[in-house]
């Protein structure tokens, strides 16, 4: 059987006669959260039965969910083949409350999705790398993470959603399927998520950044930088041997982006590793001439990690130096610290539990 979510609206229209049935199916799935063909009452009964025999919808099941006191939710999804991936729902700080101050709902959410099962980049600080690379996700498996999280949490179709491809995997190592997922998400008949509300985060595959730019998808770009010199970056991120910092900066300068937007540089700050003022000075030089925004991220320690969370004092000094030198800089407010919110933690914990019980 085939995953219907792997098909764009046009592709589905080519399969079905008459073509307008494709729009009806999209509306049932994406607008009404119906994932049982037999419930799609405006389709002929025979078509519903044929669809049920040939397709399935999504193929993800919730294996585990952890909820933080800050409202964040971390999902472990099981795929059709039994493999697992992680996704995170992050409510933004724009909640609507009742007269007692109780949160009724949030105006905006960010959903962090995975693009691969595992990852082949092998970053020293990332738990996902420990399990190695298994396979790419299909476009439908990427889309389903968003659709299912919206359905589970009863997030209305019209509610604003941001999507960040910052979960498990390197999105640009699965560019074909990620690009297709983006196109499906953009469609009004689908979830209608603007490309300007979708951000692809990459470890810096320069050649793939160029390909992404040539696709003209209109999405935002984030670079996982984490070091300001090649020597340190190669230790933290072995991919730097193939794509050094200079090549990344060149690719970023050539990347087409909305004039109102900036390229995000993610900088995971680790105590005594990359948190000095000299690091900040070098970062200012690297970003010269680039319309950039730096997002400083506290390292989230996990079992077996040799890195440590930096002091708040060093984070603020780093941020202040960048700001004084004209670079927009924020410190990411860590969410889900009381749950397994760092990439790969929930999956790793689940695998350990299975092994312990074997």
UniProtKB/Swiss-Prot annotation:
Entry keywords, A to Z: 4Fe-4S, Cytoplasm, Disulfide bond, Iron, Iron-sulfur, Metal-binding, Methyltransferase, rRNA processing, S-adenosyl-L-methionine, Transferase, tRNA processing
Pinpoint the Radical SAM core domain residues: 105-338
Under Gene3D superfamilies, the record lists: 1.10.150.530, Aldolase class I (3.20.20.70)
Which cysteines form disulfides?
112-343
Q: Which reaction does it catalyse?
A: adenosine(2503) in 23S rRNA + 2 reduced [2Fe-2S]-[ferredoxin] + 2 S-adenosyl-L-methionine = 2-methyladenosine(2503) in 23S rRNA + 5'-deoxyadenosine + L-methionine + 2 oxidized [2Fe-2S]-[ferredoxin] + S-adenosyl-L-homocysteine; adenosine(37) in tRNA + 2 reduced [2Fe-2S]-[ferredoxin] + 2 S-adenosyl-L-methionine = 2-methyladenosine(37) in tRNA + 5'-deoxyadenosine + L-methionine + 2 oxidized [2Fe-2S]-[ferredoxin] + S-adenosyl-L-homocysteine
**Which SUPFAM superfamilies does the UniProt entry name for this protein?**
Radical SAM enzymes
The cofactor(s) it depends on are: [4Fe-4S] cluster
Tell me where in or outside the cell this protein is found. Cytoplasm
- Amino-acid positions noted as binding S-adenosyl-L-methionine in the UniProt annotation, renumbered to this chain: 169-170, 201, 224-226, 300
Q: Which GO terms describe its cellular component?
A: cytoplasm
Q: How is the cofactor bound?
A: Binds 1 [4Fe-4S] cluster. The cluster is coordinated with 3 cysteines and an exchangeable S-adenosyl-L-methionine.
Q: Identify the catalytic residues.
A: 86, 343
Q: Give the E.C. number(s).
A: 2.1.1.192
InterPro entries named in the record:
Aldolase_TIM (IPR013785), Methyltransferase_A (IPR040072), RlmN_N (IPR048641), RNA_MTrfase_RlmN (IPR027492), rRNA_lsu_MTrfase_RlmN/Cfr (IPR004383), rSAM (IPR007197)
Q: Please give the function described in this protein's UniProt entry.
A: Specifically methylates position 2 of adenine 2503 in 23S rRNA and position 2 of adenine 37 in tRNAs. m2A2503 modification seems to play a crucial role in the proofreading step occurring at the peptidyl transferase center and thus would serve to optimize ribosomal fidelity.
Miscellaneous comment in the UniProt entry for this protein: Reaction proceeds by a ping-pong mechanism involving intermediate methylation of a conserved cysteine residue.
Family that this chain belongs to: Belongs to the radical SAM superfamily. RlmN family.
Protein name listed in UniProt: Dual-specificity RNA methyltransferase RlmN
What is the protein's species of origin? Answer: Campylobacter hominis (strain ATCC BAA-381 / DSM 21671 / CCUG 45161 / LMG 19568 / NCTC 13146 / CH001A)
Lineage per the UniProt record: Bacteria, Pseudomonadati, Campylobacterota, Epsilonproteobacteria, Campylobacterales
């Amino acid at each position: 059987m085939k995953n219907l979510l792997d098909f764009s609206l046009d592709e589905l229209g080519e399969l079905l006669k008459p073509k307008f049935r494709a729009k009806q199916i999209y509306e049932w799935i994406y607008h009404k959260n119906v994932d049982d063909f037999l419930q799609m009452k405006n389709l002929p009964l025979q078509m519903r039965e044929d669809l049920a025999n040939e397709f399935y919808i999504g193929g993800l099941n919730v294996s585990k969910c952890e909820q933080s006191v800050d409202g964040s939710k971390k999902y472990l999804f099981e795929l059709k083949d039994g493999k697992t991936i992680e996704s995170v729902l992050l409510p933004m700080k724009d909640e609507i409350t009742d007269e007692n101050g109780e949160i009724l709902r949030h105006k905006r959410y960010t959903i962090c999705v995975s693009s691969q099962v595992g990852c082949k980049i092998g970053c020293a600080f990332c738990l996902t790398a420990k399990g190695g690379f298994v396979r790419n996700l299909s476009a439908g498996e990427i889309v389903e993470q968003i659709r299912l999280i919206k359905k589970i949490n009863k997030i209305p179709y019209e509610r604003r959603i941001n999507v960040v491809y910052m979960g498990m995997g390197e999105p640009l190592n699965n560019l074909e399927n990620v690009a297709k997922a983006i196109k499906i998400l953009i469609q009004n008949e689908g979830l209608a998520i603007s490309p300007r509300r979708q951000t692809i985060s990459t470890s810096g595959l320069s050649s793939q950044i160029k390909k992404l730019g040539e696709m003209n998808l209109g999405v935002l770009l984030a670079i996982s930088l984490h070091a300001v010199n090649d020597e340190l970056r190669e230790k933290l991120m072995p991919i730097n041997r193939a794509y050094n910092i200079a090549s990344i900066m060149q690719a970023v300068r050539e990347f087409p982006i909305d004039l109102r937007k900036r390229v995000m540089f993610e900088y995971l700050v680790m105590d005594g590793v990359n948190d000095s003022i000299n690091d900040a000075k070098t970062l200012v030089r690297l970003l010269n001439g680039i319309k950039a925004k730096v997002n400083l991220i506290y390292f989230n320690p996990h079992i077996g990690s040799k890195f440590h969370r930096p002091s708040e004092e060093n984070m603020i000094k780093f941020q202040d130096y960048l700001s004084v030198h004209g670079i927009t800089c924020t410190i990411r407010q860590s969410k889900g610290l009381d749950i397994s919110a760092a990439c790969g933690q929930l999956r790793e914990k689940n695998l350990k539990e299975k092994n312990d019980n074997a």
